[in-house]
């Protein structure tokens, strides 16, 4: 009898498992961040592809390409700050802005470094 009762309780406990947590706002913000990050990278790639690489150093061309994509960078920075405030509601606006600046700074540095490598490869192919 006790065994049957224990089996019944265990089977009922399995039926009442908590549903997976649904976080539509967080998922939406993550998708928006991913799209803006991708758009930022595509913008820099397009600027590099269209750039005249015959005269200027690769670093200068890369810096100009990143600067030309500043509107997307700014939108990404705002979205990162919004995401930080969503995930860390106790953060002050200054903390969220600092997180956004640091996060977007890392992305910008990587895009610039990759752009330099791409430009140098193209310049070497021209020789």
Residue ranges: model-predicted function:
Residues 63-127:
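Compact alpha-helical subdomains of small soluble proteins
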Residues 23-45:
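Post-signal peptide N-terminal segment of mature Sec-exported envelope proteins
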Residues 1-8:
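Sec-dependent signal peptide recognition
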Residues 12-14:
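C-terminal motif of bacterial Sec signal peptides marking the signal peptidase cleavage site
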Residues 33-36, 50-55, 60-62, 76-80:
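Extracellular/mature segments of secreted proteins
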Residues 16-19:
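Bacterial signal peptide processing site
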């Amino acid at each position: 009898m006790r065994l049957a009762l224990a089996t019944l309780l265990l089977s009922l406990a399995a039926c009442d498992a908590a549903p997976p947590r649904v976080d539509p706002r967080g998922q939406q913000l993550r998708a928006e961040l991913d799209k803006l990050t991708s758009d930022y990278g595509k913008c820099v790639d397009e600027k590099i592809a269209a750039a005249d690489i015959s005269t200027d150093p690769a670093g200068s061309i890369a810096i100009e390409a990143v600067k030309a994509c500043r509107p997307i960078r700014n939108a990404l920075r705002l979205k990162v700050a919004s995401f930080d405030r969503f995930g860390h509601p106790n953060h002050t606006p200054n903390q969220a802005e600092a997180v956004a600046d640091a996060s977007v700074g890392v992305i910008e540095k990587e895009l610039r470094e990759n752009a330099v490598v791409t430009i140098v490869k193209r310049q070497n192919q021209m020789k």
